[in-house]
Amino acid sequence: MESQLTRPYGHEQAEEPIRIHHPEEEEHHEKGASKVLKKVKEKAKKIKNSLTKHGNGHDHDVEDDDDEYDEQDPEVHGAPVYESSAVRGGVTGKPKSLSHAGETNVPASEEIVPPGTKVFPVVSSDHTKPIEPVSLQDTSYGHEALADPVRTTETSDWEAKREAPTHYPLGVSEFSDRGESREAHQEPLNTPVSLLSATEDVTRTFAPGGEDDYLGGQRKVNVETPKRLEEDPAAPGGGSDYLSGVSNYQSKVTDPTHKGGEAGVPEIAESLGRMKVTDESPDQKSRQGREEDFPTRSHEFDLKKESDINKNSPARFGGESKAGMEEDFPTRGDVKVESGLGRDLPTGTHDQFSPELSRPKERDDSEETKDESTHETKPSTYTEQLASATSAITNKAIAAKNVVASKLGYTGENGGGQSESPVKDETPRSVTAYGQKVAGTVAEKLTPVYEKVKETGSTVMTKLPLSGGGSGVKETQQGEEKGVTAKNYISEKLKPGEEDKALSEMIAEKLHFGGGGEKKTTATKEVEVTVEKIPSDQIAEGKGHGEAVAEEGKGGEGMVGKVKGAVTSWLGGKPKSPRSVEESPQSLGTTVGTMGFSDSGGSELGGSGGGKGVQDSGN
């Protein structure tokens, strides 16, 4: 039934204009016009019901209210009664009413003039709602509704031209119910595309015809909107107006020879090239002399010549054209640098990148070596002096190891080392090697200079607080005074292994954080263990050797007393018994073997106290 109601919609329109003709004849009679209005409203309600059943049922209530307003308005305005009905017929989707009204030329003129007054209250509410269902029928049910709008535009063209100001409010009032913002856009009739619904508004708002741009344009658009729509979706990508601009832009991209194409990108490229030249101009210029000697650079300069000749060819890359533009600069040195950069970046061949990346590294290495030499020759503070000394010492440590190994192998100290080896077997082999080296070096080098080292060490300790104890500084001072071999061993001692680090950390914690008593107990225990393991004969021999060497240095008992004072001061404990003090250097030597002079703690014990102890026991 609904579809049947919509299809005879055309016949109902044919009947309605006939009834509208009678009010045209009775136009000046208010009563006849009011009757015609009622009849037309009834027909309009039927059509509305048939249309709104398709999904616009919410319009019934508002339309009924609008009908009430329409009935009141003719009584108020008098003569314009018929005109509102005629306008309703033209707007509600019954375009034949307007067409027949157009046939009666005189009443049509009177018909459209007053609606300017009545359109705002009446047509705004009543006639917009019928338009929505009609437009839905136009879009969904297609061709039947499309034929009618054409009829309206045919008759209403001259009407729209004559009384365009009155019909602008028609368009505004029609779309007022859909949104207040749509009223302002509806007057030009081409703007509210985005504001209105996709189906209705797109078909209506684009009135293509010049004559139909006002009132009939809304109706006739149903036929001719595809033309505008074809242009409109292309508007972002390229409509008739935009396609020309887009095609020009594409030609700019594909063909850089155009003046417009060269205008944008190469300027930015120039700015980038200039930035790089200003940042790296001194290095680049100095580097350019080297780079020209390489065959890859000759290739690149050949490319630069080609870019000079073919600067305007479209096949050129942006970088080469950029190089061509950059060659216009007055200074040729800068031009070469810029051209090198310009070609390296866009072309991106390995020959171009690898020399750039490799040569600066070589140059940086040479500069770094120069910097290192300058730092070594010109240290500013004591800490830097010691750091530079330790770095130089570490470089010579391997040769020093060989020297010490030769000394330990060919002198009589090897026996002492072997005598200590059964005690040191408990520790790792690397630790035993450290202990043996320490025994030999301390016995030979540090004994005659102990007093001097003690004084200098105390002064350096006061001046240079290092991470460990001051004995590490003492050892470094000793190494500087005793020569390259002592420095090498001290540097080895200052570079501990992982095991040595762990031991030195534990010892340092015990020494510095109030663990002196525990350290003394452990030292005495180690002394007892070593006394048990080492034969008494070897201990006596070790003591004899130690006393002999001490007498050669500065006297045995004086040295023993000094060792006692140093050990007790470092360990922060009470002076031990003579037995424990004499044997504690041996245990300290063993612990130094375990620590391997790893850190400040181990170097403390081994540098002075441990050194003397190893001298007593090992030799």
Swiss-Prot record:
Q: What is this protein called?
A: Low-temperature-induced 65 kDa protein
Chain intervals with Gly residues compositional bias: 603-613
Gene name on record? Answer: LTI65
Q: Where are the sequence repeats?
A: 404-408, 442-446, 460-464, 490-494, 507-511
Species in which this protein is naturally found: Arabidopsis thaliana
Regulation: induction: By low temperature, and mostly by water stress or abscisic acid (ABA).
Record PTM Phosphoserine, positions in chain: 536
**GO biological process assignments:** abscisic acid-activated signaling pathway; leaf senescence; response to abscisic acid; response to cold; response to salt stress; response to water deprivation
Work out whether the entry's keyword set contains Phosphoprotein: yes
Return the Polar residues bias intervals: 188-197, 245-254, 583-593
Biological classification of the source: Eukaryota, Viridiplantae, Streptophyta, Embryophyta, Tracheophyta
Query: What InterPro entries does this protein's entry cite?
Result: CAP160, LTI65/LTI78_PGEED, LTI65_LTI78_N, LTI65_LTI78_NYQTKV, LTI78/LTI65
